[in-house]
Amino acid sequence: MAPTEATRGGPADPAPAPEAHRGGHTEHADPAEHAAQFGAQERILTLVWGYISSEILDLATRLDLPDLMGTEERAAAELAASLDTDPVATLRLLRAFAALGLAEETGAGRFRLTPAGHRLRTDVPDSLHAFVRQGMGVFRQAWSHFDHSIRTGEPAFDQVFGTDFFSYLSERPELSGTFTSSMREATRTMSTALAKEEEYDFSSYGTVVDIGGADGSLLAAVLSAHPGVEGVVFDSPEGARDAAATLDAAGVGERGRVETGDFFTRVPGGGDLYVLKSILHDWSDARSADILRTVRAAMPAHARLLVVEVLLPDTVDSSAHPLGYLSDLYMLVNMGGRERSERDLRSLLSDTGFRTTRVRTPPGLTPFSLIEAAPV
């Protein structure tokens, strides 16, 4: 169909400014009102096209574009030649990449990465490359059945793939490796900060047990910062596959050991501090309660539990950052889990044999909070 005056330019063309009719004359609306209306439209269009931003990240990391750009200023034509991509389309991709704050155009057709863009490289300590890759993989596919989760309160992932996420992961070693790498990337900087004594005094505990500790990054940081502490990484055989190597690489292998199992049935006994970092948000209230009861049964009377999670406010207001709420739905759709408020966690702990003793949100750990509890 040939474009008409009504359709030419597509749906993103800004709507005409509202007009007011007075005494037979047409006058433009107040500039402030127009700006507000245009701002609202711009926000909605940005949200509608949010998937394009995700696709840009997906393609950039699949092409290893950030690695190719490295620390140098690069010409779009040069990058296109290296990638075997169309030079004009590559320039357009790079300009969108820059508009998202991941690069800057330093001259006509020349680009370099911003600090955020550098985190998409694979060769930097605080890389988020694997996090992007796993987020744009099987996790994304479940969103085609988002309505199932909202209608039923159950994870759409199970409906799409016929099994739950962690069972699906356990049968696919390559995907499991990507998932573990993504969690390591997301945890690395936070683990180093948490291990510092001013954030939490791990030095007062003889043995720290990291439940669901994956590749051991958190425990390695804790043991490195506190030479008098010993520790245990506990996870499934797949999850803990690289933990011993991580502890050895950090020079703490003699003080840290790895145990494998299912935290729904048992966890190592005899610890002084049990840590659950970003574990409970993977699970429903009922399954989280099962985990907490298992931990409670293993804990000596003097031991403490440290839960590390993002806490949502009891009610959302205009100052609330959307990431926590996006993560909440992400957990629902893919795992059946949820982000919780402080009130939610206190209630969950109380129902499973714990007394909350302290809740802190240290500035250096934002957006995470530390919830300490004692067995009762």
UniProtKB/Swiss-Prot annotation:
Gene3D superfamilies: 1.10.287.1350, Vaccinia Virus protein VP39, Winged helix-like DNA-binding domain superfamily/Winged helix DNA-binding domain
PROSITE patterns on file: SAM_OMT_II
Reaction equations catalysed: O-demethylpuromycin + S-adenosyl-L-methionine = puromycin + S-adenosyl-L-homocysteine + H(+)
Protein residues bound to S-adenosyl-L-methionine: 235, 261-263
Keyword Transferase: yes
Enzyme class: transferase
One of the record's GO molecular function terms: O-methyltransferase activity
One example of a Gene Ontology biological process annotation: methylation
Segments of this protein annotated with the region Disordered: 1-28
Biased composition regions of type Basic and acidic residues, renumbered to the chain: 19-28
Keyword Transferase: yes
Record EC number: 2.1.1.38
One Pfam family recorded for the sequence: Methyltransf_2
Active site: 281
Annotated keywords: Methyltransferase, S-adenosyl-L-methionine, Transferase
PANTHER family: O-METHYLTRANSFERASE CICE (PTHR43712:SF2), PUTATIVE (AFU_ORTHOLOGUE AFUA_4G14580)-RELATED (PTHR43712)
Similarity comment: family membership: Belongs to the class I-like SAM-binding methyltransferase superfamily. Cation-independent O-methyltransferase family.
Protein's name according to its UniProt entry: O-demethylpuromycin-O-methyltransferase
Organism: Streptomyces alboniger
